[in-house]
Amino acid sequence: MLVQDNLTDKQSDYAIFLPAISSFYATYIGAERYPDKVKSIIGDRLPKGIPNMEAMNWLNKQEALFPYKWSLYSAGHANMDLTVHVPKEDMVRGRSADTLMVADSGGFQIAKGVWPGAWADTKDKAAQKKREAVIKWQSGIANYGMTLDIPTWTYLDPKASEACGIKSYQDAVDATLFNNEFFMEARGKDLKILNVLQGSNHTEADSWYDTMKKFCSDKYDKPFDGWGMGGQNMCDLHLILRRLVTLIHEGLLEKGQHDWMHFLGTSKLEWALLLTDIQRSVR
């Protein structure tokens, strides 16, 4: 008989890994909870000793074989319409209140041309509809949401650039600025926001930071609540350490105010060790 291994209890002062929930995986949970509404393809394929899919749902601390209270879910994978019941979204929407969900915004979908619209045009209706949907969805399902940032490399892909209307580095910056201002006003009262930093090299990363840092400052009555490290900021150790020093000296990594720093797209084991060491040093 398999014995529960509580991974939440084993987490102490390590950098927290966020398992990214895929819509396919979540569908299996929903199919088991609502068999009359969702077709399951699991059948008899569960390994011996695993009674059901709920045993594989780490957000269910009662039934999971390996409870783990932290997760990441992306707007790019989700059904964001919270006005309707969607069984395959129940793993996320129906999670226990003692879990923690970080919601990615879908900026990657914009950068790949999957969410078309004239994102450089602040009056574009398609972009505004998606903008509103993302912040409402984040406010409804997450503890932390990320800003709807547009990566600076977006314009380098001609097809994606044409689909999303981002033609230059400055277009990406200006569109993200507008998105940030909108999120600042439209977010739900309980949603915390991570200010995502982008940039394909040190020069772009520094410029982006200087432009966006105000959203985490006391310039606003309710500033953003932490940082998302994207682009070069998530993979360049020199830049990461330099940025941390700058944040500390500028009062933008304050306990109780900027308590979360997320590194986008980072899951290699060596980075788990490195980020744990950095986290302990900062603390």
Name each region found by the language model.
Residues 1, 188-283:
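Glycine-rich phosphate/ribose-binding loops and adjacent secondary-structure elements
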Residues 1-180:
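Non-catalytic, usually N-terminal nucleic-acid engagement modules in DNA/RNA processing proteins
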Residues 129-134, 168-183, 208-212, 240-248, ...:
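A general structural detector for well-ordered alpha-helical segments in enzyme core domains, enriched
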